[in-house]
Amino acid sequence: MMKKDSDSIFPNRRTLQERNQTRKRMVAHVLRAQFKKEFKTCRILVGNHFFTVDLMSNDDEIAAKIINPGITSHNKMSSGKFQQILSSIMILKSIDSKRKLLIFTNKKMYENFCASISSMPTPICDTVNGIEIAWIPLSDEFDNYEHSEPATDFRINQDIFGRARK
């Protein structure tokens, strides 16, 4: 009979999951302060598949997907991460919430995504129409293990596109 190891063969996986949960709590704190609503994680049915919405207001009017850091060693966003973000946008677009937020927790990721999406062909660039892209500055400090209090700054659609993407 085989015995399960008590130690994970992926020791960083648990740490990463814990860090992402901490980021989610911090973002929920900022959204609660910004919108005066409670937020929770929920699973929704889209077609015949269930998807996780990172944060949904209790009245279902605001849905948010959180984009955590994922920069390569060359300070670029990988194509896999870019595709993951596009997938998150498609899920947000399929939800009936009035406001749909794509929230970055790292300034470099936010800037890289905005620069990348604005330079894409129209079909890809237009995927962000109807989505509010925001940056909540916490991961720059948090990634260095120095963040202590939840950030309260919430920056939606800074003028990277030259026009608001709503």
Regions found by a protein language model. Give the residues of each.
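Short secondary-structure capping micro-motifs at structural edges
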Residues: 40-44, 50-54, 76-77, 86-91
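Active-site beta-strand-loop-beta-strand hairpin of nuclease catalytic cores
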Residues: 51-68
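Non-catalytic C-terminal interaction segments of nucleic acid-processing enzymes
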Residues: 2, 86, 90, 115-166
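Catalytic cores of nucleic-acid endonucleases
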Residues: 66-121
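Flexible, charged surface loops at secondary-structure boundaries
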Residues: 47-48, 56-58, 94-97
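Alpha-helix C-cap/termination motif
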Residues: 33-34, 94-98, 127
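Acidic carboxylate-rich catalytic motifs and surrounding loops in phosphoryl-/glycosyl-chemistry enzymes
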Residues: 43-44, 103-107, 136-140
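Acidic-basic catalytic patches of nuclease active cores, encompassing PD-(D/E)XK
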Residues: 2-46
